[in-house]
Amino acid sequence: MTKFILKILWLDENVALAVDQIVGKGTSPLTKYFFWPRNDAWEELKKELESKHWITDLDRVELLNKATEVINYWQEEGRNRPMAEAQLKFPEVAFTGSA
């Protein structure tokens, strides 16, 4: 059962990552958005997830691995591609944005 969802804000010059907790049929924000490459979003997200001791190591690793995949995709090719393509590539991630 999925307990968390990675949320992505897809922009022209940045990509931002946040995590929501799935509660019932909805979600509740767990973290703020962390921006890449403006800041080290991955490291900031890692620290934030580690501070929430009730999140299991497995859940934390899965979220960070998926964040790595999204950041790498955005850096390598995604920043020049429409958000709809990223949504197809990462269907388990919630996307929003202007690009």
From Swiss-Prot:
InterPro entries: PSRP-3/Ycf65_sf, Ribosomal_PSRP3/Ycf65. GO terms for biological process: translation. Transmembrane segments: none annotated. One of its GO terms (cellular component) is ribonucleoprotein complex. Keywords: Ribonucleoprotein, Ribosomal protein. GO terms for molecular function: structural constituent of ribosome. It comes from the Bacteria. The keyword Transcription regulation does not apply. Pfam families: PSRP-3_Ycf65 (PF04839). Probably a ribosomal protein or a ribosome-associated protein. PANTHER family: 30S RIBOSOMAL PROTEIN 3, CHLOROPLASTIC, OS04G0461100 PROTEIN. Part of the 30S ribosomal subunit. Belongs to the chloroplast-specific ribosomal protein cS23 family. NCBIfam families: PRK02724.1. This is Probable small ribosomal subunit protein cS23. It comes from Nostoc punctiforme (strain ATCC 29133 / PCC 73102). The lineage of its organism: Bacteria, Bacillati, Cyanobacteriota, Cyanophyceae, Nostocales.
